C-alpha cells in the first residue's frame, strides 16, 4: 500500500517526506521534482519567503542509480530560512521569548491548537500548521506523477477565480489548460488574468488577502479505480478527503458538483454510448469521471475553493492567550494570495490519490508486474 508521511516545521531545519509502497524499477527524474517544487513557489501574490527559499529535494533512501528500489523512499527539503531562525527553532535549546506568539489569528489553527496541546506559545502550532508543509506533498506528488505517466495518466490545473474576478465558462480542453503554465496566476484568459492581478494588488495595498477557485483535470485514468463496496473505498471520497487536507481549502466539487442540485436528472447524468473504436464512452462529463465511487474512464474533473489566507497585514481583533486582553492578531510573513500555488499542490495531491488507487488495483511490487496487470485489464 502506497502510504506517505510528512514532517517538519515551517522555519525548522528541513521538511521531510517518507513514502512506503512505491514500486521498484520506476525511473525517477529528480530535476522534474525540483521543477514542480518551483511551480509551487511561483504565482502573483506570493510573499517574501519565496525570495529566500529555492526548494530542492534531496533523496535519502529508496532510489539507486535513478530507479526506485521498492523500499521506503525518504527525502528532505532544506529550509534556507532556518539560518535566520536557528536561535528560536533549535531542537535542543531556544531563545523563546523574542519569537513567542500569544495573539492567535482568526481563521488559523492558532488558538485551538494551543489549547488542545497545552502550549503557552502559539509558535508551536503555527510552525507545523503552516502551508509550508505542502512542499513535501508536491515532491511526493511529483514522484506519483512520474509513476502514473508510465500508464499515460497526466494531471493539469488552472485557476478559475480569484476574489470577485472569475473566468466564466468552464474550460475542459486539455491543450488550452496547459497554457496556465504561462500565466502569473495560472489563468487561461489574458484579460481575466490582468483583472485578477489588479484584485490582488488592491488587497495587498489594503493589508488584506484573497482566496479563489482552481480546477484539476486528470486524464487517462482507467475505469474501475475506487469501489462502491464500502463507503471509505470510494474514489471521490478519497480525493475530497485529500484535497480538503490542503491548508485553506474549504470546498471540493466533483464534476458539476453543486450545480447539479439545481437541475433535473435528465440534465446532469452522462448518457452511455458504445462503438467498436471507442468501446463504452460518454459525450458529456457532468459526473467528472467518477460514478458510484469509481473512475468511469472519462477525465476526472475536480474543483477546489480556497479561503483567503488568515494572516493579514491589517490584523483582526483577537484575545491574548496570556493576558486575556483584547489585542490585534499576530502578523507573520505571508502571501496576499496563494491560489495559483494551491492549484499546483492540488494537482500533486490528486495524482497521489490516483496513484494509490491505481496500485491497489494493479499491484505495487514492481513496474513490470504492474504493467502486465494493467495491460491485461485494459485490453478486455
UniProtKB/Swiss-Prot annotation:
Known catalytic reactions: 5-O-(1-carboxyvinyl)-3-phosphoshikimate = chorismate + phosphate
Enzyme class, first EC level, given as a word: lyase
Cofactor(s), names only, from the UniProt record: FMNH2
EC nos: 4.2.3.5
GO function terms (MF aspect): chorismate synthase activity; FMN binding
Amino-acid positions noted as binding FMN in the UniProt annotation, renumbered to this chain: 128-130, 247-248, 292, 307-311, 333
Protein's pathway: Metabolic intermediate biosynthesis; chorismate biosynthesis; chorismate from D-erythrose 4-phosphate and phosphoenolpyruvate: step 7/7
Pfam families reported for this sequence: Chorismate_synt (PF01264)
Annotated positions binding NADP(+): 40, 46
Keywords: Amino-acid biosynthesis, Aromatic amino acid biosynthesis, FAD, Flavoprotein, FMN, Lyase, NADP
One GO BP: amino acid biosynthetic process
CDD domains, per the entry: Chorismate_synthase (cd07304)
InterPro entries: Chorismate_synth (IPR000453), Chorismate_synth_AroC_sf (IPR035904), Chorismate_synthase_CS (IPR020541)
Cofactor binding mode and count: Reduced FMN (FMNH(2)).
GO (cellular component) term, any one: cytosol
Quaternary data: Homotetramer.
Biological role: This reaction introduces a second double bond into the aromatic ring system.
HAMAP family noted in UniProt: Chorismate_synth
Family per similarity comment: Belongs to the chorismate synthase family.
Name of the protein in question: Chorismate synthase
